[in-house]
Amino acid sequence: MSKSIVIVGAGINGLVAANYLKRSGHEVTLIEKKPSPGGACANESFIHNDIRYQYPSGASVLGLMQRFVFEETGLSTRLKTFSPESPKLAFFPNHKGPTYIYRDPNELDAELKNKWGESGDATAFRADESKIIDFIQSGYREGRTPSIDEANSVLGNDLVDLWIKGDARSLLDHYFESDLSKIYMAMTVTESGPVSLSEKYSAFTIPIMDSGSVFNGYYGFVFQGIWNLTQTLSEINIGLGVDTRLSSNLVDKD
């Protein structure tokens, strides 16, 4: 049965929800306070030598979206994307040259041992992280909220205590010996929000931030700016018949 649904907020979550609901046969109204859609995927511009340049004022890269969402919404046929496959470079003071953060766990393990004197096990870290990511992704399509009980059943208590319920500091101490390795891996937590590495459940931030599947857990770029993703999805939704109301306030509800 078709329903009339109002979604407040035209950020990426509101836009994706509107897309799926409209394609499922519902009447959808999307209300956004700002004059343009996008939420955190916003942009600003400046003029230099009579040329206007745009830059992201919020999010800048694409990484957490699931591939099936990227494809089913129609975004994959409308956008150009790029994810560099060359290793990231990590620089620390008093170290000659960069350390290469390889995607291949065995290459990464060898590099960390060579450059940072790492005697831990980066290969085991990535292998166990993949198990957690697989568990997280397993419920995305069904919209199923994961639970600790389900995690214990699928992953076992030891992995759950370490990777989900535990703190990031203890997690990194478990796999790594070098302070430089721990600092680098901890950046995933510190970049995502003001959470202490010693806080319970902070370990879960690491696999969560690597759980997108558009680029297989890595991050990439949208041609001409990440804001084109939300602008394009808004255009797709309007074409489907989503009633999109910008510069609007929600005054009351029934």
Regions found by a protein language model. Name each.
Residues 10, 16, 107, 124, ...:
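Generic recognition of stable, solvent-exposed alpha-helical segments in well-folded globular domains
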Residues 31-32, 183-184, 246:
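General beta-strand structural signal in soluble alpha/beta enzymes
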Residues 37-40, 191-195, 252-253:
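Flexible loop/turn segments at secondary-structure boundaries
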Residues 95-200:
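Rossmann-like flavin
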Residues 199-208:
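Flexible hinge/switch segments at interdomain interfaces of large molecular machines
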Residues 208-253:
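Helical element adjacent to the flavin cofactor pocket in flavoenzyme catalytic cores
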